[in-house]
Amino acid sequence: MAHRHYAVLLFSRASNISPEDPEQDYYIHHYTYVTDKGTDALNYYASSMADHAELIDADTLDELNIEIQRTIDTVTAPDYIIDHLLN
C-alpha cells in the first residue's frame, strides 16, 4: 500500500527579517518539513509560528517535489503578499 507524502513549507515576511522597506514586502521561504505521516504534517502545520505556512500532499515524492517548487515560486512572487494578505 502506497503512502501519501506531505510537506509543510514555512515562510517569513521580508519586513520581519529586514524592515528597511515595508512597502516592498514579500515572503521568503526558509524551511520545508517532509513526512509520510499526515497527522505529523498537520500537527507541524498547526503549531508553526511562521508568518505563512503551506501544507501540501502528493502520491509520490517526485510529485511532492514538483508541488513544493511550484508553491515556493507562487508564494515568494512579489504580488502574492499583496493579493493574499493585504486585500
What is each model feature region?
Residues 43-87:
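Short, mixed-charge low-complexity intrinsically disordered segments
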Residues 14-21, 63:
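Short, surface-exposed beta-strand/loop "edge" segments at domain boundaries and coil↔beta transitions
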Residues 2-4, 50:
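A short, compositionally biased
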Residues 4-14:
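A short beta-strand micro-motif
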